[in-house]
Amino acid sequence: MAPSPQACTSPLLLLLLPCLGAGPALGRGLPRPLENSEPHMIPSESQTFDLFWEKLRNESSWHSGDPQARAEGPKKPADPYLGPALHGPKAAPGVQGERLLRADDLQLARAFTSQGWTGPPDSQELLEPEAPEPHPVRAPRLTLVTTTPSSLLSAAILSTASQKPGGTAGQQPARNEELIMVKAETHITQASPWDFQGSSHTPVPETDAVRTLVLGKQGGHEQGFQEAVQGPLLTQQDPVVPGVGSTPPVKVESTPEPGAQLDLALVRSLPLPEGLPAEPPKTGAGDTWEVSSLGPQPEQTDLLGGQDSPAPQPIPPSASDTSDGHLRPVSSLNGADPISPQRVRGAMEAPGTPKSFIPDLPNSAQAANGTESPVRALQPDEAEDWPGRPQSHPPAPPVQAPSTSRRGLVRVTTQRALGQPLPPEPSASSIVPIPASSPPANATAPPLRWGPLRRVLSFSWELHVYGVGVLFLLPALLALVTVAAALAGPRLALVAAALVLVASGLRSAYMLTDPYGSQARLGVRAGLVLYNLPFPLLLTALAALTLLGLGAGLPQPLQKPLLLGIVAPVHGTCLLATDLFSTSPVLNLLTQGLSCAWGASVALGTLCLCRRRLLEGPRGWDASPGPRLLAVAGSLGLLASGLQLAASLWLYPGPGREGRFSWAWWGVHFWLRLLELTWALALALAALAATRPRPPTEHACWAKLLRLACPAPTGKSEVPERPNNCYAGPSGLGTGGLDISKSLIRNAAGEAGLPVTPGSGPWGSAASLGRGRPGGQRMSRGSVGPAPSLSELDLRPPSPINLSRSIDAALFREHLVRESVFQRCGLRGLASSPTGGALRPRRGSQPDAELDGAGTSLLRGRCRSLTEVCLRTSLPQHVMEPPVGAAAAGTSGSSLDSFSKGSLKISWNPWRHGLSSVDSLPLDELPSTVQLLPPPTPVPAPARAGEPQGEGQSRCKSSESHSASSDTIEL
């Protein structure tokens, strides 16, 4: 069919619209139906409109000056399968296309709507290049970006002749140019080159702006063509340069902006990178340049249209490509780094439009507020993604274009074509922002929910929640064992163990059920109760154990457990009431402050009492473990009180802290849980130590083990290394309890006819170690009295021989002294009747150990009075002078007292002077005690026989203290 010289592509588009059907994309941004808009060209500023259209298949070029050409349109049947891209760069050699020259603000960005090259055409399409295979008609996807009733819709396909290797024809000087290209995504069955006829073109301004109309459908089938409605163009015909390689098409598209005036899509041809060699086009890969412009454009131009051709249109090379003498195809950018963003002057934006430099998806829904959502652009080293595609690395986070007040941003990137189309990208409003490693505690921080907290804290979150929940079961189990095994123990210890059990169970249930309200399983009030209740329970347990172990150091009013029983319920009730019924955060914070102050006071008091006990008591580790455990528990309670107050700031509403994550929140709660866990363990151990029975001083089993491990050497008695007389009891101790006389060497009573002395019996030896009162209370064998002091102990060791008998046998012979020096029988015989007499008690002997009647008669028969020896000789007058006054009447008492008080000093030796009897002794060498003896005077007999004995006993008691002085005996 021969085309009319005046036809343009606008009628062709209008004819295609009814066939394609009106979709939801047609009515978007249209103030009235599309058929009401009439394509027209309005001249302005007295400029001539010249349209030069290239002829298809050896036809002459069309001129836009004929007004009749508008009514006619090309009757070429269009392929019903229209798509946004061609099946590959298969451009035939042709002429160099027109240049579009204009300086403006542009943004070249690779949008997510372009599906790129769909790969090389299949074998069936290559075998049938002449006629397209019929396919069932499907409703194509039609995307129409903004238009107005006066908008002008036309299509222009600009092609450039590809350059042969080594060719230098068709070079143009470098200049600022703008390209509007159409990227067709359908493989055209006819492959014939364009024939361009050169002629100069003039600027064709236009009054209204136009937008890009994209006709196509989704899928991998053959697709139609894509036409772009273009703005102000400055065209220039270039000479035909045959070339071997072909360049991929470039898609021109403008972003929709509701409410703004229609603007022109203008593309500035950017120079290619220098130094890149030209390479032949690849069938299965290509580079796609998509250009989007922002804001309304101040200029309007006419459109150059061309009839669709079976081959894609080549792109005119830029001025930088021709500067080195030959043309470079755009396909040489395959695999090259993207061009860095460039800013271009002159871009304008309509007031009130959002400043987004990345174009929106044509098929994506607008946001609720009408603003455009920024879409992530693929990086140069990042391949396109689609559902089901295996990924070797995690996807990169979305890159959002910064909002700036600058006029425009040009971003040029290259894209490797893949065999699969891109899926529609979700809008940025549905993407949850992932916080950085240190997110601020504000509205942008993630909420306190399980998912965001798990993403931020990774495995630390689950380790904290489940670890603390399980570890709190340990003090609960220990407290349960304490309560069950020691029901008969102290009540305060059992109460403390029960409180630790309840507090540990509540904390474990809170962490395993709904930690910090992150899973919303519990209500707000129930969560507050479970969070705050363990603190007063543990604090009450600490106070109970302190009162039990260290209550003696407290004042008397504070030692009553009833006071603790009143304060503890009031503390817990106030916290529960404010958490359940209070609606004022100030009241809740005030209650928490008072609770923490009370906890700090109890902990400090415990520490002070422990310090006093440890300083005053024994310092051994095993002496008193109670104060040390309580000191550890008090320190942990003091720290927990401070952190509990800090954590309460996140429990109630606050500026910028309600339900938001922050690293301060995480640090406070992490350390508070650890302190509570250690505190509960210390209290459980202290309660267990208080309820267990006290071990004996020496455990029987332990003693057996020590004897087996360290046996004593043979032949060594296990007598303790201490004085053996220190076992003597106090003054009231009898012979039954501590009788050590069995281990002493003693003479038998009455041996060799000797008299029985008080020290020779069993009690005599025991009494010499510990003196007791006559008739004193006797203790039982198993009873233990208080230890005697050093002043009461007689540290003299017990004598292995009977010294009294030895001294009497050595000194006092029959011819010297007929009686013992240590007995009073001879002296009593002088002052009393022969029937009455008593023995003088030895120092340290038992006072009531007196001789009975038989013993007295026996001793009296054998004893001779010392006065008998003295009276046989002549004594001086002063010696024989009787006492005066009352002394004569009480001769017996005064003489005995003076004899007892006097010091017995025996200093003479009869055999030293060669004397054989006392008669030969001089008077000056007689014993000094003889001078104290009064002359014998008659004494009336006592009324009763037992009276002298009692009188002598009383005298012995009175003279006991005076006889404590040592007697000197010089041999």
From Swiss-Prot:
Modified residues (Phosphoserine): 768, 780, 783, 789, 799, 806, 845, 865, 894-895, 903
Main location: membrane
Biased composition range(s): Low complexity: 239-252, 427-445
Keyword tags: Glycoprotein, Membrane, Methylation, Phosphoprotein, Signal, Transmembrane, Transmembrane helix
Bilayer-spanning residue ranges: 468-488, 492-512, 533-553, 561-581, 589-609, 629-649, 670-690
Subcellular location: Membrane
Cytoplasmic membrane side: 489-491, 554-560, 610-628, 691-971
Extracellular-side segments: 28-467, 513-532, 582-588, 650-669
Residue ranges, compositional bias (Polar residues): 290-300, 363-372, 401-417, 951-971
One GO cellular component term noted in the UniProt record for this chain: membrane
Membrane topology, as annotated: Multi-pass membrane protein
Modified residues (Omega-N-methylarginine): 771
List of glycosylated residues: 58, 369
UniProt region (Disordered), positions on chain: 60-94, 114-137, 236-256, 272-445, 753-799, 832-855, 927-971
Signal peptide stretch: 1-27
UniProt name for this protein: Proline-rich transmembrane protein 3
